[in-house]
């Protein structure tokens, strides 16, 4: 059986890796520890990594739902994009009552080798930037999201 990552183990492996993931890598402790990677090659885009059981989730914030002109239209476009952009999906999480945040996310097995984890991080970052550019006309104004992606 392959090694199954823990958040701490993955954090240490990312720091020690020779696979050249350029950026700031931080471990955030708490009820559900996660790793934050600020990717220099993608304009310091922050990407979050969470290991939970057999699953590893990589995500990056897009923008708050309040920044979207027409939520129904945007949701339809996002759902149509997901099958075409199979490695990353757009989701919606609640930050607080009345505050929803669109995210780009991808998942893989917590048993994936480090090269695949790093590839997922890079692909997700690239897809986040592409989504920000593709959906710019769906936003109320040009905003800088929590992820630092300007649309």
Go through the PLM ranges and name each one:
Residues 59-100:
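Short, internal acidic amphipathic alpha-helical interface segments
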Residues 101-106:
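Short, aliphatic-rich beta-strand segments
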Residues 40-42, 63, 109:
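Residue-level signature for short turns and capping positions that connect secondary-structure elements
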């Amino acid at each position: 059986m392959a090694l199954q990552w823990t958040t701490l183990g993955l954090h240490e492996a990312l720091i020690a890796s020779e696979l050249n993931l350029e950026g700031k890598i931080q471990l955030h402790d708490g009820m559900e520890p996660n790793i934050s990677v600020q990717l220099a090659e993608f304009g310091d885009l922050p990407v979050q990594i969470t290991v939970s059981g057999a699953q590893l989730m990589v995500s990056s914030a897009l923008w708050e739902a309040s920044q979207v002109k027409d939520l129904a239209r945007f949701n339809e476009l996002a759902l149509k994009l997901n099958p075409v952009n199979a490695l990353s999906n757009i989701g919606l999480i609640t930050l607080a009552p009345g505050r929803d945040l669109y995210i780009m996310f991808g998942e893989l097995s917590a048993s994936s080798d480090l090269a695949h984890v790093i590839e997922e991080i890079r692909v997700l970052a690239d897809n986040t930037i592409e989504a920000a550019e593709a959906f710019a006309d769906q936003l109320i104004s040009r905003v800088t999201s929590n992820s630092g992606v300007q649309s």
